[in-house]
Amino acid sequence: MRYLPKSQSDRDQMLRELGCATIDDLFAPIPAEYRLTRDLAIPRQYGESEILDFFKQRASENANGYSIFIGAGAYNHYRPVVIDSLISRGEWFTAYTPYQPEISQGTLQAIFEFQSMICELTGMEVANASMYDGSTGAAEAIMMAVRLTGRHSAIIANTVHPEYREVIATYAQHQGLPISHVGYNAETGRVDIKALEAAITDQTAAVLIQSPNFFGTIEDVAAIADLVHKKGALLVVSISEALSLGLIKPPSEADIISMESQSFGVPLGYGGPYVGVIATKEKFVRQIPGRLCGQTVDRNGKRGFVLTLSTREQHIRREKATSNICTNQALIALIASIFMTVYGKQGLRELAKQNLAKTAYAVSAFEKAGAKVLFKNSPFFNEFVVQTKSDSRELNDKLISDKIIGGFPLKKFYPELGNSAVWCVTELNAKAAIDAAAKGVAQ
């Protein structure tokens, strides 16, 4: 893309339109001490070979060969090579947004297939094309429950990802939506059922839980669903580790499922871009946020795909929209679709079994090394909480020297758990690496 700078006459005309005589007048509202008065420190332009050398040097600084034991919403799973090969095709890998979407039948079919696979995976009847990520998906699911029930408050379990809770708080603040929280059972690491029952009122629109939760334990979704529904509220279940559905019964007792699909072939990528999704029952379809792709036939009787029920801000008046998110994570959803297709039902199940088996081995190894594993009598998938004598951050600093990236320290969000961290084990953690991590924690 060419760079076409503005001429001085262009700048003068723009200033006149704004009622300013000079650039200084334009920036007058910004205090002088915060304004840059020198040229930007930009190096000279590079030739092509120099640019390649520059990025090779930067790439050589990457940290390779580390054993990653941190999850907490972003999981280090194997990415089949075929994914990047397929998504790099020009039909997919483009900055173009199809504002006449029916022209791009291939894109719409890919979205439709993604929705179909998500429904099969979650046991729900309808799924949207995507949300930004798991956190925005959870927030949008609560707003959806508010619209469906006409009630005006929500309850969130403290075992939900802390940063998901922060995103929801931002949404709720600007919607004037009261949010309350319920704690967890100190023995099980699961939602405190009695506290939840006492917290639900006739104004509670939604109860949000996460399973597996932030501690890695699997919640009793059926029992919580019965309790929530008896009170006339809706149950929203957040899933941050999508691979768990390869082995664990999907929480179909929920009214709405919000899920982060990063585990399905999406690179960690410094936290994004990821792909959230909302799945729900068909009777709630008109309040689901985000894009929906439907299958139909054209006037010649041929199968075709269309965007349907487009009730987002991009298409209708803002105040009537179900969501103000105008971006669809179509390319990232395609990655997840390719991943699920490559592995298939049996492959996902086998991959999930490997995660569970290696995590069970890690729990045993950590205990043998003298570490205390919390909530160990509760069912888990691929994360567990380890409590140590030394500070978790200091421990991680020591482990880094052995090329081990340790667990996620909990003290910031759960001070009552002291020197504890959530450790994650996936199919990429070899037995030798698990043993080395356990030994490092013991020392």
Swiss-Prot record:
Top-rank EC class of the record's enzyme: oxidoreductase
Pfam family, one: GDC-P
Catalytic function, reaction form: N(6)-[(R)-lipoyl]-L-lysyl-[glycine-cleavage complex H protein] + glycine + H(+) = N(6)-[(R)-S(8)-aminomethyldihydrolipoyl]-L-lysyl-[glycine-cleavage complex H protein] + CO2
EC number of the protein: 1.4.4.2
Gene Ontology molecular function terms on file: glycine dehydrogenase (decarboxylating) activity
InterPro entries: GcvPA, GDC-P_N, GDC_P, PyrdxlP-dep_Trfase, PyrdxlP-dep_Trfase_major, PyrdxlP-dep_Trfase_small
Membrane spanning stretches: none
Superkingdom of the organism of origin: Bacteria
Function: The glycine cleavage system catalyzes the degradation of glycine. The P protein binds the alpha-amino group of glycine through its pyridoxal phosphate cofactor; CO(2) is released and the remaining methylamine moiety is then transferred to the lipoamide cofactor of the H protein.
Protein name: Probable glycine dehydrogenase (decarboxylating) subunit 1
